[in-house]
Amino acid sequence: MPDAAAVARDAAEAESAFAHPPVEPDLTWAYGDHPDQIVDFYAPRGPERESVPLVVVFHGGAWRAPYDRRHISPFADFLARRGFAVASVEYRRGRDIPQPRARADTAAPVAGRWPETFDDVAAAMDGLPVAVARLLPGADLRRTVLTGHSAGGHLALWAAARHVLPRGSAWRTETPANLRGVVALAPLADLARAAELGVCGGAVRQLLGGEAEFAARCASADPALLLPTGIATVVVQGQEDIVVPPAVADSYAEAAAKAGESVGLTLLPEVGHFPLIDPAADACAVAVEEIAQLAW
């Protein structure tokens, strides 16, 4: 269990990250009929360029319904103010019908929908090239970087690994996505390890439909099992993170190494979970620099 000082640090960091008001997008595109099947677009700010990289953002929140893309909109705007075109992806979370909880006494909302959460990420990624060309004409799709925070980091890694999904998967693509790379921020990158650690109150098992389905579905959902991807990947992790402990990132990097792939792992001392998406924090600038290194 984290000590009192760690809990206090986490609370202060969360308060700072969520103190920024939501930033309205320039445009919103619907990739499906459900209200959550939308992508917010932020046009690049600052000096006009003929073309700029595209950053696709997946928000976190343990795949739970109360936490949507609005909480990461200040981060999306931060990217736009640094000259990137940004696509912030919403996706279905939680459930409208009961789903088994990790513990009978938990008060947390149920996490994720199987298969809808993954359906949505795949559909958004498949539709983005045409939508971006129409709505963000200055965005250079050849310089696309995926990023995501926490549960969104898991989705970013998964979206980049669809070409190594098991054959027969409805989400599998025959060729890799045209990406410069992925920068995953405190990601739930190894679902099995995260489940062992009880990260986010059982959310990992709930995402895949509960304990009975977990092991079988990991083969189609766990980035640590979808390796190597052949796509440049960087994980940025706060060493003091008590929400998604560094052990999860370490486990993913080890799995990549065993698969013959090198994953960049940037460990930030005295940083917890939320500064990575807090425009007021130095850690956020580090995260954006990692994105820039791949994109430019």
What are these model-predicted stretches?
Residues D126-L197:
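Primarily recognizes the serine-hydrolase "nucleophile elbow" in alpha/beta-hydrolase
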Residues V235-Q237, D241:
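Short beta-strand/loop motif that positions the catalytic acidic residue
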Residues S16-F18, E24, A192-L225:
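Mobile cap/lid helix-loop segments that gate and shape the active-site cleft of serine hydrolases
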Residues R45-S51, V55-F78:
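Short, surface-exposed "cap/lid" segments of acyl-processing enzymes
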Residues P2-E48:
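N-terminal cap/lid segment of alpha/beta-hydrolase-fold proteins
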Residues V236, D250-W296:
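C-terminal catalytic histidine-bearing segment of alpha/beta-hydrolase fold enzymes
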Residues P66-A76, A87-R142, P279:
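Catalytic nucleophile-loop/oxyanion-hole region of alpha/beta-hydrolase
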Residues I242-S251:
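Conserved alpha/beta-hydrolase "acid-adjacent" motif
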